[in-house]
Amino acid sequence: MPILTQRSARVRDARKLTRRQGRAKAGLFLAEGPQAVREALAATARQRPGLVTDLFASPPAATRYADIVDAALAAGVSVHHADEPALAALSETMTPQGLVAVCRLLSVPLDAALDGAPHLVAILAEARDPGNAGTVIRSADAAGADAVVLTRGSVDPHGGKSVRASAGSVFHLPICADADLETTIAAARARGLHVLAADGAGDLDLDEAEATGLLARPTAWLFGNEARGLPSTARELADEVVRVPIYGRAESLNLATAAAVCMYASARVQRRVR
């Protein structure tokens, strides 16, 4: 098998996917590292044939992760050996692990993301930090959420930092990107979801929300921008505004931590009452 370099056409085309514009134009994104690639291939085998189109592997990585290469070949994925500089050009990390998969974009329409009878949904309103977005997706997956929606003005969940921070969870649950905020809230409510906005100035704290039975209801949690918090529209349209209680001296929690606390609080109560 020939070894591709940075000048190879396939590598040059794949490198365009490190930018949001390139991903949108091609309808593709990159998943880097063995964990992400394994989950992408598992999703391909489980329910999304054709999700992974290509796999780039350095010769050492192809040997070290022979099981991943074999799974890719079995799924009909085009496997390419590439040298270390080529893999580094496709990576956004300081220490590339030698495996990069090219995948089809995951974002689905809002109706598809909220299909069925969802019990727990996370909505990110104008979240800009890719690491936070990926971590929220990971936490939503761990809490058993049915979907994650990112509204217009939010970071692209297909970016390298978001995909890495999700630790493969982007392949586990429906994700809708670039959704209209008001339309999203209306759609969530139409599916019987109680819309709770997480905000440090909320009228209720999370303990009170649990004590009153609020968390037992099917819920869409709204989380805002890391610096500015929730858009005023989100606060106005939410059914309740809830704050995470701070028992110590910390000024606040960051977005990803607050989201994990809120979603797990809902998941724990919902699992008891189902």
Task: List where the protein language model places each region.
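Short glycine-rich anion-binding loops that position phosphate/pyrophosphate groups of nucleotides
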Residues: 34, 60-62, 86, 106, ...
